Amino acid sequence: MGTDTLLVFVILGVTVALFVSDRLRLDLVALMSLLALLLTGILTPPQALAGFADPLVLMIAGLFVVSTGLFQTGIAARLGRWLGRAAGTSEVRLIALVMIVTALLSGFMSSTGTVAVMLPVVVSLAWRARISPSKLLIPLTMASLLGGMMTLIGTPPNLVASNQLVAQGMPGFGFFAFTPLGLAMLLIGLVFMVTVGRHWLPSRAPASPGGEGEGQPSLAELAEQYELPASVFRATLPDESPLVGRTLQELGWPERHQVQVLAIDTEPDAVRNHRRSRRHLERSKAIGPTTALEAGDRLLLQGQRSSIDEVADAYELRVEPVDPNAEGVVPRNLGFVEVLPTPRSRWLNQTLAELHFRDRFGVQVVAVRRDGATITEGLARLTIRFGDTLLVEGTRKAFELLRRERLDAVVLADPGALEAEAPRAERAPIALAIMIAMLVVMTFAWVPNVVAVGVAAVLMVLTGCLTMDDAYRGINWEAVVLIAAILPMATALEITGGLQLAVDGLVAGLGPLGPFAMLAGLFVLTSVASQVISNTATAVLLAPIAFQTALLLDVSPYPLLMTVALAASTAFATPVASPVNTLVLGPGQYRFGDFLRVGVVLQLLVLAATLLLVPILLPF
């Protein structure tokens, strides 16, 4: 082994270790790897930067734009509303329909975008059917990953595998080359989940909403879910109260006393007719840090009795306990929803204060659930992370503002989730026509795939299906930069002999056992790697190895590359294996073992199906 080869393996090892550690962003790690290859002289600048001009990278960026166009025009949301009408209350039927609709969408949209659309719909359906969302959300994520196996554009690993063939002067996979195998995998996953898998899923998330058919949990249920005190009290401000004129921000009760102000109401008009104000006439509305208190205000407070008494004594308040679920206690125009930031949300790595949450949306964050723990103190200074679940209080009008932030957040427990209109719903027929035209052109290969995707992406903007700002925000830049920066690693392995060394080792170990053993080995290696690092990075690193292995064994590279593509999409077994798993972690109140228990079995089933079907459809 030469010095350059050893150096490349060291850089690759450090890169993979940083991927697994999750200490740094994946795209940053890939760029660091690229710079290391440049600084050590292993790659020349043109070789190192070739990934950014690769048609694969440009095509994936274009597909994100097309997917965002479908998202913004509500194509996916319409399917979700149909699901709401057709699903009924049967758990088996719900699981089956959720998986079918989700897989269909993720065959043409990104899996993350699909889950972001379907998540609030599925949670609302679960509550309507009195079923725990935990029973439906893992099937949702698995269907999104299985659906990505059904078309060439379903997931980046499919494109990576096809691009490997094209780069070697061979025809790439056709648009529907993945469809028979993808449908078979979906059927296997569907049968497994409705017969066995659903019994292994927990019923941890609350199953019953606050009212019949509301699809929204009650205050008491949310208090239990977020480990908040369920005791609710009403305190009235006397005319001489020292609190009059002070704002909630000045008081700082959540931080100082662990007491939340849920709402501000007034005494009946007949009693305080002489002190009517705009707020009194409205009876109640959402409140925020700048809300100033007035004499006669009635505050709806939540907290432990001892904390409430502490506040009452300190500020001379008259306090009485109330039933939070009694009619009229919590004003009708106020409610609670859970909000999740998306993987590409602009909220990430910012505090609630920096986001001006109350000023922008007219809501207040009551609690944040992170890594299974509830945070109620210091919320204004809390930095938002992907995977957080925010418990938000506000009016339905405010929730509508939140729901419009489709690229930044997913709103759960919202009664309007099933009826919500997309911001550009009137452009849906145009977006659908563009999508169909792109598929036809790619199927018949009239122009290169990258051209078809590029034209479709531009047409989405020109026809008003989305704006250029939406297009830029819709692109998963982390994935694009990751692919562009990691592709040269394959070049470095090839020119230093590292690729041949890896292939020789794989062939020496599994070659004597035949091509089926090689398929199994590649599947296991790819599937295990995809649980801990990006499935796209896994495919980029293993596709060249699969191709060279096929040449050394004197077999067709098509079945081996298809196996790598399929295995890269089996990120079922851990909550961090894929962004879609992380997205449902909070709403489903899942634990690591929930994914492991169901995911490993499904991986084994997909492995068995791959070994059976791939050699039949793509002979050696």
Predicted regions mapped to residue ranges:
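Alpha-helical transmembrane segments of multi-pass membrane proteins
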Residues: 92-104, 131-147, 178, 515-528, ...
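Juxtamembrane and boundary regions of transmembrane helices in multi-pass small-molecule transporters
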Residues: 128-139, 147-221, 226-229, 301-302, ...
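Transmembrane alpha-helix interface/packing and boundary motifs in multi-pass membrane proteins
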Residues: 15-24, 101-110, 143-153, 440-446, ...
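Membrane-embedded alpha-helical segments and adjacent helix-loop junctions characteristic
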Residues: 28, 33-35, 39-129, 189-202, ...
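Structured cytosolic domains appended to multi-pass membrane proteins
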Residues: 230-422
